[in-house]
Structure formats: C-alpha cells, structure tokens
C-alpha cells in the first residue's frame, strides 16, 4: 500500500461538522438533528444511509402471537365483543412495548364487561413496559368475559405472521405480523451551508420520531454505530502505520516548515493569541490538531480556522496530519538552525 501519510489527506482534509445541533422533545421521542458543514453530496449520502438503518435495523419489542379463549382462528367473531378477532389483532399490533429481556415474555389480558378494554388492563409483567396504555383493545358487552394471552419477542424490522408461527402451533394460536422497529418516522432534508466565503457545502437536517422505547437521539447514535461497523470491513489498513527509520539520518524526514514557530505565520492577533493560549509553539504542533480540536479552543472560531487552513495549504500542510516521532528531541536547535538558513 502507498504511504498512509500521503493518502491520509483523502479523509483528513475533508471538512467535518465540529458538533451536531440536537433539539429533543421533552419526552425524548422526537429529535431534530442538524449537521453542517458537510462536503457537497455528503448530506444525501449520510441522510439516506442513516434513514434506511434507522427504519430497518434498530431493535425493539412486539407481540408475535395471541390466544383468545374460545377462538380457533382470526376470521371469527366473539359473543359479547363488539370487535371481531381481525380488529383485535390490528389493535394488538399497535401496542408499543419496551422489553429489557431477550427471551419471549407472555402478557395476559383478563377482563369483564361492560366497557372499553385498554392496554392498561393488561397484567403487569417484569421486564415489559407498555408505552401506550390508553390504546383500546376491544369493547365488551355486559357480563362478557374476555381472556387473551400475548407472546412478546424482540427483534428488528418487520417479520410476517408466517415467520412467527411455530412448526407445531397449539390449538387456537394466532400468529401475527410483528413490527419490531421502535422508529416510527424518519425524514431528512439538505440545504446549502456556508463555510467562510464558500457556499458549496451541505447542511443535513434530520427529524426522527420513536415510540418512546428508545430516545430519538440514541436511535440515531445506534444507527451511526451500525453504519460504522459495517464500513470497517472495507478499511484494509491499520492506523497508525509505522514508518521505517533509516539507520543514518541527519535531516528530518518531514516538511521543514513544521520546525518553524507559529508566530512566524502571518496570522491575525486573535488567531495568534488562541494558539499561544493552547500552548501551540511550532507549526508541527499545530498541524496535528484536528479541525474539531481547534474549534473547541476558547475564542477560536470558523474565521480563524479558515485563516489557518489557508496559510497551511500554501506550505503543502493541513490540519489532522500524523507526524511520526514528533517532536524531535533537539527541536529547539533544529528550529534555530532553520531560522538562520531562512
């Protein structure tokens, strides 16, 4: 493989957001996330990828099958129950559940009429939380007894009823479709972002809504982690790469500008003060800082960042470089020698 120090510019020189702007609802089920600036086209790349992962790969809990006393299949009606079994199945599918168990759990609903039977009437079970207790399951007439058992599993995405049906189902077991995903809605839009005087950058705006079993912000974080994990297999090198050291080397094997002090750069007073306050003495110290690290420096803004990037570009340098064996043991002597030569 070619030198990593040369090719690292492929990813280290790309602009990245210093941080995300996240706005979360009080119940944490809705989040608006803004990432800017991004390289042109990266808004679509990231937004579409994260949306697909959010909707397909975040794990959750759902009912997989039910059994109702006196019912053999779903295409029937129950005496004293206003809804037929098909309607009850649809209502059960709408249950929003949170499970802290990886094993199948059983929920029991045992009720007597008359009246409206809700999810809150389901008997409490350890490790299972019902997030929409006001959901109506069915309506019972007077003197009607209704008993239903529901099996709850965990998984991801959508699983059809046929996949939830065991090979030898007990009499009266009705397998139902399971939508495990806790993510209800994901949308994104892309607009133009400004970076200095340039307007050819992307701003990614994502809105995520969940059923409450997971916060919208965490759902985005987990989807990004899934994406990262899948991409790792394509990276065929390790960081950092050791650079072979020559047996005899009287001169440094890096850009001599790295030995110059930052106060030799023609920077504004504000930028120079920020560098001094961060104890950045040599240009070699400066270029090893990432854009994010620089922007976290007190009083250091985008204007100062762009100013420094422009100066470094003129020296064929950039922020985020990796410089093996920096700083040299005799850096003060080497810097002085270079200054005399200049």
Swiss-Prot record:
GO terms for cellular component: cytoplasm; DNA-directed RNA polymerase complex. It holds the Pfam family RNA_pol_L. Residues 254-342 are annotated as: Alpha C-terminal domain (alpha-CTD). GO terms for biological process: DNA-templated transcription. InterPro entries: DNA-dir_RNA_pol_insert, DNA-dir_RNA_pol_RpoA/D/Rpb3, DNA-dir_RpoA, RBP11-like, RNAP_asu_C, RNApol_insert_sf. Its EC number is 2.7.7.6. Gene3D superfamilies: 5' to 3' exonuclease, C-terminal subdomain, DNA-directed RNA polymerase, insert domain, RNA polymerase, RBP11-like subunit. Keywords: DNA-directed RNA polymerase, Nucleotidyltransferase, Transcription, Transferase. The N-terminal domain is essential for RNAP assembly and basal transcription, whereas the C-terminal domain is involved in interaction with transcriptional regulators and with upstream promoter elements. Homodimer. The RNAP catalytic core consists of 2 alpha, 1 beta, 1 beta' and 1 omega subunit. When a sigma factor is associated with the core the holoenzyme is formed, which can initiate transcription. DNA-dependent RNA polymerase catalyzes the transcription of DNA into RNA using the four ribonucleoside triphosphates as substrates. Belongs to the RNA polymerase alpha chain family. This is DNA-directed RNA polymerase subunit alpha.
